[in-house]
From Swiss-Prot:
Binds 1 zinc ion per subunit. It comes from Pongo abelii. The keyword Oxidoreductase applies. This is Methionine-R-sulfoxide reductase B3. Residues 45-167 form the MsrB domain. InterPro entries: Met_Sox_Rdtase_MsrB, Met_Sox_Rdtase_MsrB_dom, Mss4-like_sf. Its EC number is 1.8.4.12, 1.8.4.14. Pfam families: SelR. Monomer. Residues 1-28 form the signal peptide.
Amino acid sequence: MSPQRTLPRPLSLCLCLCLCLAAALGSAQSGSCRDKKNCKVVFSQQELRKRLTPLQYHVTQEKGTESAFEGEYTHHKDPGIYKCVVCGTPLFKSETKFDSGSGWPSFHDVISSEAITFTDDFSYGMHRVETSCSQCGAHLGHIFDDGPRPTGKRYCINSAALSFTPADSSGAAEGESGVASPAQADKAEL
């Protein structure tokens, strides 16, 4: 038998403590813009605590998760645009929302591929892909590859990370998204 090589016990403990400290410091940062220079819109924690509900702050800034089936938009079916609750960036159209049975609002596509940032998330001993607002870094939820066609994606988003702008008869919600409908495009060409 060959001798087994192990680290000296004090060195093992020190290494373990350093890894735990690094993990704790990494998870304590607000939002998903690790370096605020990467965020296009930056808010102070003080301002966010005043403006957001405790649940909205916990979800968007501390990467929390609201209870399943209890979010404001879980069963919401009105036409309109879902936006980031922190900065107002348009994220999802109501036409892409579907009932996944997961207990959280689910969408199969985003308004713009630039609206959301993806980050590997290894919390809770598993690998997932976190979704964050690319403008302000707010944690939104996660994306999975078990959604419906045409994308096969399921953006599983916390209601607390969203605000909603209803569509009205003039299509104002569509116009706010920066994405014109085909009917609006035709009118512009006339």
